[in-house]
Amino acid sequence: MVDSDIQIPTSFDPFAEAEITDATGSTKEYVHIRIQQRNGRKSLTTVQGLKKELSYDKILKDLKKALCCNGTVVNDKELGKVIQLQGDQRKNVSTFIVQAGIVKKDQIKVHNF
């Protein structure tokens, strides 16, 4: 007898929710802010989904200066350009990009809270 309600544990993919569709079938333009564990207490904050016409290098430079952390822009095949910052900067990044006028508050999805 097999119980189909039991979920089999699988590996966690932090980018699995990147393509979210609404009721009309079109994808919403969300900016996803996630955290990934590295080794030990070290973590990495990723910002994905910013508009392509924005200057990622200027945004990264301002983020690094405002948050006092190191970071880089990574070009991913599936996700496009992703900003990576050292440390848990989820709240700081979300408030920064709203105050800078890059995106609106309702366009941000903060994951892993």
Swiss-Prot record:
Q: Does the keyword Lyase apply?
A: no
Give the matching InterPro entries. SUI1, SUI1_dom_sf, SUI1_euk
- Alphabetically ordered keywords of this record: Protein biosynthesis, Translation regulation
The GO annotation for biological process reads: regulation of translation
List GO molecular-function terms, semicolon-separated.
translation initiation factor activity
**Record keywords: Protein biosynthesis included?**
yes
Q: Which Gene3D superfamilies match?
A: SUI1-like domain
Q: State the source organism's domain of life.
A: Eukaryota
UniProt family annotation: Belongs to the SUI1 family.
The entry's function note states: Probably involved in translation.
Question: Matching NCBIfam families, A to Z?
Answer: SUI1_MOF2
Q: Entry's PANTHER family?
A: EUKARYOTIC TRANSLATION INITIATION FACTOR SUI1
Name this polypeptide is given: Protein translation factor SUI1 homolog
